[in-house]
Amino acid sequence: GGTLFGIGMTIAGGCANKNLIRLGAGSLRSLVVLVFLGISAYMTLKGLFGQWRAGFLDPIAVDLSRWNLPNQGLPGLLSRATGLSEKTALLGTSLALGLGLMAFVFKDGRFRRNVQQVLGGVALGLLVVAAWYLTGHIGHGENPDTLETVYFATSSRTLESLSFVAPTAYSLELMMLWTDQTLRVTFGIATAAGVALGSLVYALATQKFRWEGFASVEDLRTQLFGAVLMGFGGVTSIGCTIGQGMSGVSTLGIGSFLALAGIVAGAVGTMKWQQR
């Protein structure tokens, strides 16, 4: 899933989040990409692609209990391998990855000197944490109708953070079935709409709003193919560059690192092929 998403976002000119930003800035091309991405994602969640996904892909899984691992977190794996306590393993893993990533990004002098990018990265990280807190703490409570403990306003019925593939699909569903009283504006839908709206406000404030379309029929064909790959791959990998690359990795889950590796491999491989 990650590999297909990486291929798709490269040939479509950007991931779901980037296309939402471009949509707010006036890109009709991104509007078409998002519509096809949403349709593909919805087909993978509940439609034609979903039947194949549920029948052939979902049953394939690694049974972590065979190694007495309680979950797929890296700290648990480190604790099991070294005998360290879970708290020590969590602290060590967090420090190693955090410091390693900081060393990697700050070795680039251009990035260090770009205060706007540094502050933007910090803000994105804080938003991921805030989203976990919002959906997992504030949005978690007792349903007054059933008296069961539930997560409110999330499509997955569990806590969520920033992600944009499935929310794009659910946004299309909500707009098409607006009168269905069982549907509601979830955290993911609100986040996707907020990104596009924020981009629109920024583009208008800085006078960068420009209408943009497709350059040619070939450009249209390529973008649509990439959008379909992103929709299928994003659902299959349970996240996109933001959903797995930031939100997922913040949980230190092995699956998120695998998905991120697939996204990077797919993107790099596609760019190499384009530049051949």
Please report, for each region that a protein language model flagged, where it lies by residue:
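Membrane-interfacial helix-loop segments of redox and metal-homeostasis proteins
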Residues: G1-R276
